[in-house]
Amino acid sequence: MNQEYLDFELPIAELEAKIEALRAASDDKVDLTDEIKRLQKKSNELTKKTFANLDAWQVSRMARHPNRPYTLDYIEHIFTEFEELAGDRAFADDKAIVGGLARLDGRPVMVIGHQKGRSVKEKVQRNFGMPAPEGYRKALRLMEMAERFKLPIITFIDTPGAYPGIGAEERGQAEAIARNLREMAQLTVPVICTVIGEGGSGGALAIGVGDKVNMLQYSTYSVISPEGCASILWKSAEKASTAAEVMGLTASRLKELNLIDSIVQEPLGGAHRSYLEIAENLKLRLKEDLAELDELSKEELLNRRYERLMSYGYC
């Protein structure tokens, strides 16, 4: 995969291009090791400085980074024996949501998540990560299966929102989301949700009701996109950066408001810089959460989840 850069990463990109050029030019006759090390140190320092001061709009763009790992990438690096299950048994199989049985260090679990595409063909196939009602009904079918077999449920959230097309509305988009919210609140097995990219409105919430809700460091969670908010309040999407600041959509802000449980640290420069490192960090978080939830009885699990939901809106 070709490395892509956002505009605020361009100075870093220039240094990395120089490093690659020196590596290509270095051979037995010309030793450029010291110069490469100097530039590498400079690049690391610049990256640390840049990412230590990201504003909310920059974080929003990081959450959408084209090289960022998606659900299937995390499944590949965290779980074993993944067996994808398809279809809602009513209308179709929505490729914007993937899910199935897997093992987390040998333990059977149910994994469900939004899936975006990388190439144009994949983006169309995955509908840009925007599920239709059948996607949410597929997710619910898998959750009900997990409850029957007493399997923990792990969800990965990464969507700009539920698909707003006419067909989706005709097939009951709002009902599908609402039903998922209700049923997830009543599941008697542990549910762990993680925002890995964009957490867009009801489309995210439909697989986001859990006992633990985590966010990756450069992910976002909001009722609307910054561009959408700006278009409504200021009649111009160009005010997106201003909207992002006032929306409080970053992981750090949502942690302050007690709307999420923990923030999973990303590698220097973002999750796309090292799929292995971010997968290891997230896997550790999932295992710790599961160990904690395993100590609770069914009644304690449900009571704690209810209290969690009822606390929203109070600081």
Swiss-Prot record:
EC primary class: transferase
Domain of life: Bacteria
Protein location: Cytoplasm
Quaternary context: Acetyl-CoA carboxylase is a heterohexamer composed of biotin carboxyl carrier protein (AccB), biotin carboxylase (AccC) and two subunits each of ACCase subunit alpha (AccA) and ACCase subunit beta (AccD).
Gene: accA
Protein's pathway: Lipid metabolism; malonyl-CoA biosynthesis; malonyl-CoA from acetyl-CoA: step 1/1
Biological process (GO), any one: malonyl-CoA biosynthetic process
One Gene Ontology term of the molecular function aspect: acetyl-CoA carboxylase activity
UniProt family annotation: Belongs to the AccA family.
InterPro entries, A to Z: Acetyl_CoA_COase_a_su (IPR001095), ClpP/crotonase-like_dom_sf (IPR029045), COA_CT_C (IPR011763)
Any GO CC annotation of this UniProt entry: acetyl-CoA carboxylase complex
Pfam families assigned: ACCA (PF03255)
Function: Component of the acetyl coenzyme A carboxylase (ACC) complex. First, biotin carboxylase catalyzes the carboxylation of biotin on its carrier protein (BCCP) and then the CO(2) group is transferred by the carboxyltransferase to acetyl-CoA to form malonyl-CoA.
Sorted UniProt keywords: ATP-binding, Cytoplasm, Fatty acid biosynthesis, Fatty acid metabolism, Lipid biosynthesis, Lipid metabolism, Nucleotide-binding, Transferase
EC number: 2.1.3.15
Reactions catalysed according to its record: N(6)-carboxybiotinyl-L-lysyl-[protein] + acetyl-CoA = N(6)-biotinyl-L-lysyl-[protein] + malonyl-CoA
Presence of keyword Lipid biosynthesis: yes
Domain CoA carboxyltransferase C-terminal: 38-292
Protein name as catalogued: Acetyl-coenzyme A carboxylase carboxyl transferase subunit alpha
